[in-house]
Amino acid sequence: MIASSAKIHPSSAIENGAVIGENVKIGPFCHIGPNVVLADDVEILSHVAVIGHTSVGKGTKIFPGAVIGGDSQSVHHSALNTKLVIGENCTIREGVTMNTGTVEHGGATIVGNNNLFLAYSHVAHDCRLGNNIILSNNVMLAGHVTVEDRAILGGGSAVHQFTRIGRQAFIGGLSAVSYDVIPYGMLNGNPGVLSGLNVVGMTRAGIDRPAIHRVRRCYKQIFEGDGSIRANAAAIRNEYLDCAPAIEILDFIAAESDRALSSPNRGAKG
């Protein structure tokens, strides 16, 4: 079904079954598969493939060379009807690739709203991305990665499968992210080492100075205490019940995960 207001270049192939919303623009030499849904106001520039069971949210813009909704690159991919769901108002730049999920792990790759994917970044199967995230050029997310709201990943960084990146974390360019990164954490290097808190991001998010000072104190107690990271976090929880950002970090640490936690020491040399 193609809305009457959609504008589609005659050189593009729209397969039967695709759903094309109002005011969608599709430029030259694009391929839209039979199980694709493009919501209203989506814009696809040129030489883009949107395939698989893929839905693209309202107002999202996709630049040349992107391949959206390709099969999982997992060796265990069952080739069944898994899906990719992309939210509203995302910008997907040149050469970006996003894969559908795998049946074995829920069958869906989920991307939220207002995200920016710069050139040649990659979102693998079964990833879960929140809102207002930036993946800079050549960022690589392996399968099953979770990236929470407002995280920023610097150019060329690579994230190990099943890793979690907390809300408003900042990953430096060319970093290797092998372990979970706490909310508001900053990670740099290869191997990646936690290097403090994203204070600039916290300030931009409207967190006031007294709260930032408390979160800094919480951070030191977690990573410089005598016990393990998780034991230290559990021991201080009651002290921060009235500080939402600190509790967010403590809850993140307490949650079950397939990966260990990044720290100022794990991965550091010397």
From Swiss-Prot:
Give one GO term, molecular function aspect. Answer: acyl-[acyl-carrier-protein]-UDP-N-acetylglucosamine O-acyltransferase activity
Q: Which reaction does it catalyse?
A: a (3R)-hydroxyacyl-[ACP] + UDP-N-acetyl-alpha-D-glucosamine = a UDP-3-O-[(3R)-3-hydroxyacyl]-N-acetyl-alpha-D-glucosamine + holo-[ACP]
Q: Which PROSITE patterns does the protein's record reference?
A: HEXAPEP_TRANSFERASES
Q: Output the GO biological process annotations, alphabetical, semicolon-separated.
A: lipid A biosynthetic process
Q: Does the keyword Transit peptide apply?
A: no
Q: Where in the cell is it found?
A: Cytoplasm
Q: Which UniProt keywords apply?
A: Acyltransferase, Cytoplasm, Lipid A biosynthesis, Lipid biosynthesis, Lipid metabolism, Repeat, Transferase
Recorded metabolic or biological pathway in which this protein acts: Glycolipid biosynthesis; lipid IV(A) biosynthesis; lipid IV(A) from (3R)-3-hydroxytetradecanoyl-[acyl-carrier-protein] and UDP-N-acetyl-alpha-D-glucosamine: step 1/6
**Classification via SUPFAM superfamilies:** Trimeric LpxA-like enzymes
A matching Pfam family: Acetyltransf_11
UniProt EC number: 2.3.1.129
Self-association and partners: Homotrimer.
Q: Which family does it belong to?
A: Belongs to the transferase hexapeptide repeat family. LpxA subfamily.
Purpose: Involved in the biosynthesis of lipid A, a phosphorylated glycolipid that anchors the lipopolysaccharide to the outer membrane of the cell.
Q: What is this protein called?
A: Acyl-[acyl-carrier-protein]--UDP-N-acetylglucosamine O-acyltransferase
Q: Organism source for this protein? A: Rhizobium meliloti (strain 1021)
